[in-house]
């Protein structure tokens, strides 16, 4: 199936759901990402990765990794919506646009098309966030994330850098690309907007960025050095290595000190920052495999941990946090071990920063496991179906921990 058809399915379902569904049937919005993930399985698969630096070759198709990311993220987003206590039907429109844009971005070899597609997704989300909760946090999201997409668009006309492998041009392009990736993935010092959005909006409103768009941008960021950046390659990689490690340490510490309701968001951002630092700072290592293991773990557990603590799922939440703690044989242990191995091959400073970040994430996960929630008997009865789904997701997380590389290879082909 052509990527344009898949994108049209995402967009069409999103528009129809927001126009047709009402409050009683609002939970059917989950069908948008679920069907989108289903049709992505039918995509025409390319044997080579769609590197967004290969020249103006257009949209060629999804490779195995891109297909796996979109399918896993779509299913995870559907489960996030299913487990929410309430859903706004207008979210379907934003989900449809983000899913369509993510499909085009993953299938494109044209850097301008990739940048514009990501920009369309970010613009749609930011406009919805501002409409839902106008204020400093959502306006900051528009400024910073918008600057990130603008940086990618500004860099795209210069790619590939044929004949300009040295001098100022590759360095400027490398800085622009690093700025765009850091802003879109909420890596400090450009990550404050995500913290504000997570603390202001409902989880269902943040989920399209957190569950669907972030994994896509992470994979695209990993592919960027595959093009001919010349002297800009070390600039791009070193900038993301430094800011990624700094962001991971900062996010881990604030996951301990910050509000309980924002703990998962900060842990997620810290893990993604570690992935960015390792994948870009050690591209010839097992870093990508470790990053994919962490991504699939978060996709499996996000539906549980993005649900409000007051809404139940006490024991599944505790087990989910245990799986994120990094204690063996949890899946995050293997993912972070591969990332640490990759960073240790570089220099001692990177290793120390990564160990501090991982230690902070461990402490935050232990604190979350010890949090108690009181539920009335009637509330427990009503929670049977969500708890069943939550335990199923926990079982998937345990399976990832028992066979991390095999399952990551099955999902992402890597």
Across the structure, where does each feature detected by a protein language model lie?
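Small-residue-rich segments of transmembrane alpha-helices in multi-pass membrane proteins
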Residues: 32-44, 95-106, 142-160, 204-220, ...
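Cytoplasmic/organellar membrane-interface segments at the starts of transmembrane helices
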Residues: 366-414
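Membrane-interface helix termini and inter-helical loops of multi-pass transporters
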Residues: 47-61, 161-169, 222-236, 334-343, ...
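Alpha-helical multi-pass transmembrane bundles of energy-transducing inner-membrane proteins
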Residues: 17-29, 91-175, 182-188, 254-312
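Alpha-helical transmembrane segments of multi-pass integral membrane proteins
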Residues: 347-372, 390
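Structural signature of hydrophobic alpha-helical transmembrane segments
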Residues: 1-10, 59-73, 109-122, 168-183, ...
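Short helix-boundary/re-entrant hairpin motifs in multi-pass inner-membrane proteins
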Residues: 31-40, 47-54, 79, 83, ...
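Transmembrane helix-loop-helix hairpins at membrane boundaries of multipass inner-membrane proteins
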Residues: 1-86, 92-93, 408-413
